[in-house]
């Protein structure tokens, strides 16, 4: 007697015709076509154009001149570019781990609070994200002011400093001030994501581990941390991208000064392209001499 499982296994799905498969494939590509056109026109083509332009001396006042790899040699010989590269690396290395660690700590502390309290904390930390960068910059510029800023006032009040410090006009402090602002505007989204991820962890597993004698750290490290790893990876990616793209704070606060101490790759590209009009900006730069003549060091 043939079993029911054998009968079921012997039944094969009807094979679809090649015409139907071809029709579905064409329909799929037609749905994909608008996005593909946008991707080719606004991503792939500009990338190819940038690579081609990097082999020319391209300015607005004359025709492009083919120079081969001279632009690359000039770029890496420019100490201002090397400084911008170093500053960008410092911003990424400092801001990414600090943002992720602080966001995870805050989220772990507020996730078990009453719902209205958790929502309040999320709103407070997310407020700088939805606030315009210009408004945020104006507030921080007032706080950093070397005459009446709140940092100088509090520093002298508690005895940390003896005299006012020009926070944005001193090479020793300017980049650190930029990183501090970037941190306050970057933790909002990770906190919201971490609170959501921690709230989705199966509490029955956590309770079972606690009954077996697991400590809070062991519950976090063995149960919660693996569960929120996908969220952590996403946060690391977006935080790294945001750190590399730090531009508005630099432009509005220091313009790369003082003495190029807050230059980043994004601001360097902007200044080279839209101030000096050298459109091989993504891979080339003006000479250090030309750049120094055309730009005075900025200070707060």
Task: Locate each region found by the language model.
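Short, Lys/Arg-rich, polar N-terminal cytosolic tail immediately upstream
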Residues: 1-21
């Amino acid at each position: 007697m043939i079993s029911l499982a054998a009968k079921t296994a012997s039944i094969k799905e009807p094979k679809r015709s090649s015409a139907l498969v071809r029709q579905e494939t064409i329909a799929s590509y037609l749905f994909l076509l608008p996005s593909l056109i946008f991707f080719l026109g606004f991503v792939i083509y500009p990338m190819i154009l940038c690579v081609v332009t990097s082999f020319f001396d391209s300015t607005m006042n004359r025709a492009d001149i083919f120079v081969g790899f001279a632009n690359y040699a000039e770029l890496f010989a420019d100490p201002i570019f090397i400084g911008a590269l170093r500053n960008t690396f410092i911003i990424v290395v400092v801001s990414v781990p600090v943002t992720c660690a602080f966001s995870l700590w805050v989220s772990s502390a507020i996730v078990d609070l009453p719902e209205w309290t958790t929502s309040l904390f999320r709103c407070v930390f997310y407020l700088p994200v939805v606030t315009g960068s210009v408004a945020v910059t104006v507030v921080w510029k007032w706080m950093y002011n070397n005459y009446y800023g709140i940092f100088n006032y509090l520093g002298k009040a508690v005895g940390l400093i003896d005299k006012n410090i020009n926070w944005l006009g001193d090479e020793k402090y300017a980049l650190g001030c930029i990183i501090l602002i970037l941190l306050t505007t970057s933790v909002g989204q990770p906190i919201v994501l971490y609170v959501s991820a921690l709230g989705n962890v199966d509490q029955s597993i956590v309770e079972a581990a606690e009954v077996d004698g697991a400590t809070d750290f062991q519950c976090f490290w063995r149960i919660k941390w693996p569960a929120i790893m996908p969220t952590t990876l996403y946060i690391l990616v977006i935080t790294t991208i945001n750190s590399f793209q730090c531009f508005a704070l630099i432009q509005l606060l220091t313009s790369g000064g003082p003495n190029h101490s807050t230059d980043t790759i994004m601001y360097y590209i902007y200044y080279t392209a839209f101030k000096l009009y050298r459109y091989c900006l993504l891979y080339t730069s003006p000479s250090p001499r030309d750049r120094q003549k055309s730009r005075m060091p900025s200070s707060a």
